Amino acid sequence: MPVSLHSPAQQRLAQIDQVRHTVMTEGRSARAMLVDSWGDRSWIERSWRRCLGAGRRPDQALTFDVLPAQARRRTEEANQTLLTAARPVLDKLGRAIANSHYFAILTDAHGVVIDVNGPIDQSDRRARLLTRIGVDLSERAVGTTAISAALAEQKPVWLHRGEHFFNDTAIYSCAGAPLFGPDGQCAGMLDLTGIEAPERPELRHLVAQWARSIENSLALARPHALLLRVNWPGCGLGDDADGLVALDGDGNVVSVNATARQMLAQLGTGRLQAHSSELFAMPWELLFDAARRDRPVEVPLWSGLVLQVLAQSPGNVAAPRSSGHDPRLPLRDVEAALIRKAVAESQGNVKEAARILGISRATVYRKLGRK
């Protein structure tokens, strides 16, 4: 049955055409149209304007160039860690989207395709163009896409048909999410693309989840002596929603995922040179003891907040150097001991002890009151 011109799908495409005309032909901002919800998609207009500023026109033909053989080899070698971490995840993702008319594309941090998966119709030239290893899908090469937008905006995006810059790419609908490595830097991106497919904005959530799985694989690939799975109290532990903090044998942070960076402000974006004692308000050696408990424990932060931590050893890890603390001491008692020590060093001045610890006086009284 033909689709009504008044169907939501047709109205959406008509709205996109209006916005394109406003921005690309009239040179006005899309905001001038007062289009519902366009404000949170202003990144599309920014990308369009970058393309226009570079002298590109929407009706220009695209060639979807592949890098020369030597450059492809260099790209593959440079991204071997990402490929190794991503391939098992891509295999699972490919099965998950097998009946969706969308396929998966993995690119490096520059938008060059390094792997693909899912239901790719090799008889369709439009699919083949995008899924060749080494094809450059950056904004510079093919304009506004979910790939270029995810890399530029550093966040998950959804792009439908004419929201792409070039007419040649207006047949595609794409969801994209950036991939961040253990050092907090963008390592690449994951894309889901359909050709003349129904709009599926929920794929933005799906691609973000699978991107998180790849990020976790990257974090776990770094050699480490202890892995800390962290989450807030009351939340489960043991899946891709965990924050991951990996330590060496001296308690130094060697790898983290993006979730952990959001929970532990000291790590910040791009910061990796930190010691676990800067993160957790307890002797760091006790984290290794927690791995022998094989169950989550509550660990205090210097802010006064508490994280739930599941410490896991990758094998027979040598015990860290002794700090003189009893390794059998429950972690909640360590927290109270640290507070008592701060109060003693402040000569009983609870206000000063709270300031040093970065917590409230009420927290100090509460923690001490339970002993």
Describe every region a protein language model picked out.
Residues 1-141, 145-161, 165, 171, ...:
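Intrinsically disordered, low-complexity terminal regulatory regions
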Residues 114-115, 264, 357:
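PAS-family sensory domains
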Residues 119-122, 126, 264-272:
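PAS/PAS-like sensory domain cap-loop motif
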Residues 147, 268, 276, 284:
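N-terminal sensory regulatory modules of PAS/LOV and PAS-like folds
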Residues 162-163, 171-176, 279-325:
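PAS-family sensory/regulatory modules and their coupling/dimerization elements
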Residues 230, 234, 316-333:
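Regulatory hinge/linker segments at domain boundaries
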Residues 325-371:
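Bacterial C-terminal helix-turn-helix
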